[in-house]
C-alpha cells in the first residue's frame, strides 16, 4: 500500500556514477583553516543533486611499490558551509559534489556502526575523535545493509589498520559504497562553530571547476526540514527477522523464558535493535514505514515497536496516523524517531534542536528512580513536554540540556525513549528498557 503524499520528496542520497581516479603526487599539504567567501545570508533551500566518482589510490596511507606508506597528499577538497566559511581538506572515498547537513558525533569508537545508521541520511557526520580508521571495517558491525549518510568528516585518517576482525580499510569501504569523505581538516574548529551557530548545511566538493560562491549558493538553497527521509531508508516489503544472534552479541542471556511476537515498523531500523529484541525472546516481523495499521493488528502481535529513523517527524504525517491507530490496542515501544512520532500521535509537538544529540556519552536521568545512565543518542528533533496531554509522563531527561528523553503512558500501554538502549555503538546502561517492554507485553497477556 502506497504512503500518502509527504510534505516534500526525499533527496537522492547516493552519487550517480563511479570511476577510477589517478593517484596524487607527493606534495606539501595546504593549510586547512577556514576563509570567508561572502556575508552570511538567510534564505530558502531546495534539494541539491550530487554526481560523484569513486577514488582510487589517493588516500592517506597509499601503498607504493616499495611497500612504504606515504600519508602526504594535496588538499583537493572543500567543505563550504552556509555561513560562508570554506574549509580546505583532503579527500578519500568518493569524489564529486554533495550537499547535506553537518552534525558532529562525540563517540570515540564505532564509526562503522555510525556510517551504516540510517538515521544519518542526508547528513555529513563529523567525528570529534581525531583518529578514525584505526580498526578498519568488518561485515559484523553494520547496522543496516548500506550507508545513507551524505559523507564523513574526520581529522586524521589512519594510515594502517589493526584489528583481528578487519576485512578492509575505511578508505576501501567508502569507495565501494560511493560515500565521500574528507580528512586533514580542523574538526575541532568546525565543531565549535556548530555548537555556537547550530547545525549548518554544507557542500563537500572535489570539483575544482566550481567556485566557492557556487558551492555556497548550493548550501543556502538546500532544504532538509520538512523532507520525508524515511521513505528512502525503509524496507520495501514485510519480512521476518531471522538473523541468528551469536553469543558475541548476547552480552545478557536468559532475560525471558516466554516468546513474544513483535511487529517492528522500519523507519530506518538498526540491526542491533532487532538483535536485542531477539535476545529477549521476541519473534520479529519487520514492516515498511507506510504499512497499514489494520494489517499489523490483524497479525495479533504481542507488541509493536516503532524504530529510529532520519529527519523531521513532522514530514511523515502518514507515520503519525499509523501510530495513532495502534496505540492503546497493544503494548508499544518507540525509540528515537519512534519516540517523536508517539509524542505527535498523543497530540504533542516536536521541534528542531540547535545542533542535536549525536554520540555515546549523553547522561540521562530516569525520573522514576533517580538512576543516571550514560546513553547513545542520535537525533536533531525533540518532543516538547509542555505540549503533551494530561496523563503522559516524562520519565527521562537529558542532563546536558534537560530535554525530554523518555515518555510513558500506562493507560495506553506505551513507553518511548529519545535515545538508543541497544547502544551500537555506546554503553549498555539502558538495555533494561527492552526488559520493560517485555514486562508490558507479559502483563497484557494476563
Swiss-Prot record:
What biological-process GO terms show up in the record?
'de novo' pyrimidine nucleobase biosynthetic process; 'de novo' UMP biosynthetic process; glutamine metabolic process; L-arginine biosynthetic process
Low complexity bias: start-end ranges: 1-32
Looking at the record, the residues that make up the Glutamine amidotransferase type-1 domain are 261-446
Family annotation (SMART domains):
CPSase_sm_chain
Q: In which pathway does it act?
A: Amino-acid biosynthesis; L-arginine biosynthesis; carbamoyl phosphate from bicarbonate: step 1/1; Pyrimidine metabolism; UMP biosynthesis via de novo pathway; (S)-dihydroorotate from bicarbonate: step 1/3
Give the PROSITE patterns listed for this entry: GATASE_TYPE_1
**Keywords per UniProt:** Amino-acid biosynthesis, Arginine biosynthesis, ATP-binding, Chloroplast, Glutamine amidotransferase, Ligase, Nucleotide-binding, Plastid, Pyrimidine biosynthesis, Transit peptide
Give me the reactions it catalyses. hydrogencarbonate + L-glutamine + 2 ATP + H2O = carbamoyl phosphate + L-glutamate + 2 ADP + phosphate + 2 H(+)
- Pfam families found in the cross-reference section: CPSase_sm_chain (PF00988), GATase (PF00117)
NCBIfam families noted in UniProt:
CPSaseIIsmall, PRK12838.1
Q: Which family does it belong to?
A: Belongs to the CarA family.
Q: What is this protein called?
A: Carbamoyl phosphate synthase small chain, chloroplastic
Q: Which organism is it from?
A: Oryza sativa subsp. japonica (Rice)
The upper taxonomy is:
Eukaryota, Viridiplantae, Streptophyta, Embryophyta, Tracheophyta
